[in-house]
Amino acid sequence: MSVQDKQGQNINVGDTVYTPYRGGKHEGQVADIVTTKEEAAEKGVKNPPKVLFTDQNNKDVAHNPGTLTDLDKQK
């Protein structure tokens, strides 16, 4: 199953993604994409699909794909 960002571009592992968040931003390289409830339970996230990445502050984050912008597809 593929997931798309808010512009409808496919998000792949290794892509750089961005989302505004609480007056700042989360930006990082996609480490994993969770699409099933089983994967979500294994990775400790809820309500798949989720895109997992480490942001610029080395914090592990999980976001809904529709909230993200794939910066690699913007170039």
Curated annotation (Swiss-Prot):
InterPro entries: Hva1_TUDOR
Role of this protein: May play a role in primary metabolism.
Organism expressing this protein natively: Cryptococcus neoformans var. grubii serotype A (strain H99 / ATCC 208821 / CBS 10515 / FGSC 9487)
Top-rank taxon: Eukaryota
Coiled coil spans: none
Upregulation: Repressed in models of infection.
Pfam families documented for this protein: Hva1_TUDOR
Loss of function: phenotype: Leads to abnormal metabolite levels including decreased levels of 2-ketoglutarate and increased levels of phosphoenolpyruvate. When in the presence of NADPH, increases virulence in a macrophage infection model.
Bias (Polar residues): 1-13
Region (Disordered): 1-24, 40-75
UniProt-recorded name of the protein: Putative primary metabolism protein HVA1
